[in-house]
Amino acid sequence: MIKAYAALEANGKLQPFEYDPGALGANEVEIEVQYCGVCHSDLSMINNEWGISNYPLVPGHEVVGTVAAMGEGVNHVEVGDLVGLGWHSGYCMTCHSCLSGYHNLCATAESTIVGHYGGFGDRVRAKGVSVVKLPKGIDLASAGPLFCGGITVFSPMVELSLKPTAKVAVIGIGGLGHLAVQFLRAWGCEVTAFTSSARKQTEVLELGAHHILDSTNPEAIASAEGKFDYIISTVNLKLDWNLYISTLAPQGHFHFVGVVLEPLDLNLFPLLMGQRSVSASPVGSPATIATMLDFAVRHDIKPVVEQFSFDQINEAIAHLESGKAHYRVVLSHSKN
């Protein structure tokens, strides 16, 4: 039996929950969980904000742990290996996206917390292809958020062929944005942070931003007209997108990684005349995750985390929901 924590209904508190996972599949890995990040997507699933939640719901998709068991078809990890698991717990492996290496775009990809019990427990299972071995030297306590927040901002840097000479702005310096700033600085880019938090300004500079602009001040935003080659938006609220797009240089690219549920209100003419573009992306493939982890270790990039024990799980969730979390929250089974 696997001991976990589950929401039994929308907006419900998490409760102890046991389930029998059945026989381990030939292509499955069972992970003994050491740490698991708490992401805003977990909150959305607990509260059924996206209308895709099934209860009992065991959240948790930023898993770090050791391989406890594996099926006979798994050969890239061994029992005892340190591994991580992110948003996806499996892929079809036969569609064009999978065969092209874009597993994260697989139309039938299995989510770790949608119709599947996630990592808020002592163990979790997933298809082997979605389980990524951790590189030596990585900090285990802070590695979990890299499997969602980290790859969410790193993947478009790879897919958009971001040049190290680019001028890049990040909207929102929270769980995603503080990682984007670190990755972009290490990539070689000139980084500007749009933030509404006066208290974060010194810290954002320490994380690697070259410039800061007040996102609550339209004049400050407008002062950057035509400046940026890329903008990465990490926020989940509606903003004046046309004002931000005015800060793109010709052929500039605006990329969404934060989930904004409201329809976008965009003026086409500035996009057309400046050959500017708008796009979005979800997480990344296992191969890109592995590349990101190596890059993070090489450049000493770490999520800033606050740690709670698993028996404080509802306290941790309330802390994140309140907006008081210092970037990322991680649950721990560690005795330390």
Curated annotation (Swiss-Prot):
Broad class of the protein's primary localization: cytoplasm
SMART domains: PKS_ER (SM00829)
Compartment(s) where it occurs, according to its Swiss-Prot or TrEMBL record: Cytoplasm
Subunit field text: Homotetramer.
Catalytic activity, reaction form: a primary alcohol + NADP(+) = an aldehyde + NADPH + H(+)
Cofactor(s) required for function per UniProt: Zn(2+)
Any Gene Ontology CC annotation: cytoplasm
Top-level lineage group: Bacteria
Function description: Active on a wide variety of primary alcohols and their corresponding aldehydes, but not against ketones nor secondary alcohols. Active on aliphatic compounds up to 5 carbons in length and aromatic alcohols, less effective on branched-chain primary alcohols. Prefers NADPH to NADH. Its catalytic efficiency is greatest for aldehydes, suggesting the reduction of aromatic and medium-chain aliphatic aldehydes is its in vivo activity. Plays a role in tolerance to internally produced ethanol.
Annotated organism of origin: Synechocystis sp. (strain ATCC 27184 / PCC 6803 / Kazusa)
Family, as annotated: Belongs to the zinc-containing alcohol dehydrogenase family.
EC numbers for this chain: 1.1.1.2
GO molecular-function term, one example from the UniProt record: zinc ion binding
Positions bound to Zn(2+) 2: C92, C95, C98, C106
Cofactor detail note: Zn(2+) and Co(2+) are equally efficient in vitro, Fe(2+) is less efficient.
Protein name, as recorded: Aldehyde reductase AdhA
Phenotype upon gene inactivation: Unable to grow heterotrophically on glucose in the dark. Cells photobleach and have significantly reduced survival in 4% ethanol, reduced tolerance to internally produced ethanol.
Induction remark: Induced by salt stress (0.5 M NaCl) under control of rre1 and hik34. Transcription induced by 0.5 M NaCl, 0.5 M sorbitol, heat shock (45 degrees Celsius) and benzyl alcohol (a membrane fluidifier) but not H(2)O(2) or high-light treatment; the induction kinetics are not all the same. Response to all stresses is mediated (in part) by two-component system rre1 and hik34. Expressed at a low constitutive level, protein levels increase 2 hours after sorbitol exposure and 8 hours after NaCl exposure (at protein level). Protein levels do not change upon heat shock (followed for 24 hours).
Keyword Metal-binding tagged: yes
Keyword ATP-binding carried by entry: no
Top-level class of the enzyme under EC nomenclature: oxidoreductase
Biotechnology: Can be used to make bioethanol by insertion of a cassette with Z.mobilis pyruvate decarboxylase and endogenous adhA (this gene) into 2 loci (slr0168 and phaAB). Up to 5.5 g/L, 212 mg/L/day, of ethanol can be produced.
